[in-house]
Amino acid sequence: MEADGLSTTMEEGFKGLLRLMGSVKNYDWGRSAKESCVGRLYRLNSGRKIDEKQQYAEFWMGTHDSGPSYIVEEGGRIQNGYANGGGVRNKSTLKDWIEKNPSVLGETVLSKWGTQLPFLFKVLSIEKALSIQAHPDKDLAILLHKEQPLVYKDDNHKPEMALALTEFEALCGFISLEELKVIVQTVPEIVEVVGNALAELVLDLNEDDEEEKGKLVLRKLFTEIMSASKDVITEVLAKLISRLNIKNKVRELTDKEQLVLGLEKQYPADVGVLAAFLFNYVKLNPGEALYLGANEPHAYVYGECIECMATSDNVVRAGLTPKHRDVRTLCSMLTYRQGNPEILHGTAINPYTMRYLPPFDEFEVDRCILPPYSTVAFPSAPGPSMFVVMGGEGTMTTSAEVIVAEGDVLFAPANTNITIATSSGLHLYRAGVNSRFFEE
């Protein structure tokens, strides 16, 4: 049975809620089972025991083949509504189900993206920094997938947004020209790698120069660092760490310097440790978000977050990772824009819900925190929605009432009115197609 008591082959006009089982990723940078929000969510969502020896990094909700969501039927939460982990996974994926029931996406979404769910929804638990990476634009994604399908597994672009659940740290985009000059003047190890001539080019730049000139110099600088030999990087990092440890005895290190020391412990002799000086070091409080367009460098450093993106798993990596590195592609694809990223604080759409709208058609995210004995309405949207319950319990009502609790994941078709209520408090997130897309 489905969440509303219907079979997995739905009639046209289905307006219920479809309960899902997500996929988990056990990457090295994730948090231990006991400390990981992802591990807890996966245990509650799937009813499976978690491996205490594993790191739990990502919980995926969507249709991507690398981590599909499955329809849940019979038993457990489906029959009695409670979080006892007894749900049975159907053989049908959400992707299969949508292809059989395309009307659930809504006419506007179907005409733009076909039967593909436009967004991929995730929860991340980060203990150790992720790789310095960027996601290709649509044209580059098509090319990379064609040339290296085992590495780049689809042909879609991957703009994304991270919404902090806890205090959250990230490297995001290149620092301003003014900050870059300070780095060149105060981090001699960078000059040792790139040479005095290139360092002088940076210092000679000014705000009146054409933007493309600045981008060209920054590209040369970044490429020289990322392309340096392992021996050179090992040598200069040893000098850097020694210098910072000595400085730490006479003055308090800057946040960036402390970050670099921490990264070196996680990734000894890795070029990404030195490259970190070139990026904005961003700290988010819970409820704050940052977004990343195609071809923008970034590395999540620490914390837990909700993440939403276009449906893709394409990542070009070049530092802070044991995985495949593609330095040439990364250095050639970046925009080399400089300056601080925009931090989103959300816009209130009702007393309990904040909406985060990045400049991408594929997705938006709502953060809903209901106090005890409260009710909120999610009016029908022209596109589909995905909900994940992060805490508490309550009910979600469409054509029928469904009891929900922490770990539940539900898919709502387009044009579905939903009322959410709780007597004890409820914390959930919704992903949907960007509402601005429907206003165009």
Residue ranges and their predicted role:
Residues I349-Y352, E364-A381:
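Conserved short histidine dyad/triad with adjacent acidic residue
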Residues G303-R355:
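C-terminal, non-catalytic macromolecule-binding modules
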Residues K122-V123, L130-S131, E160, Y281-V282, ...:
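His/acidic/aromatic-lined binding-pocket segments of jelly-roll/cupin-type domains
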Residues S69-G75, L94-L110, G114, G173-S176, ...:
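A short beta-strand-loop-beta hairpin characteristic of the jelly-roll/cupin
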Residues P286-G287, G293-N295, P371-Y373, G392, ...:
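Tight coil/turn sites that cap or link beta-strands
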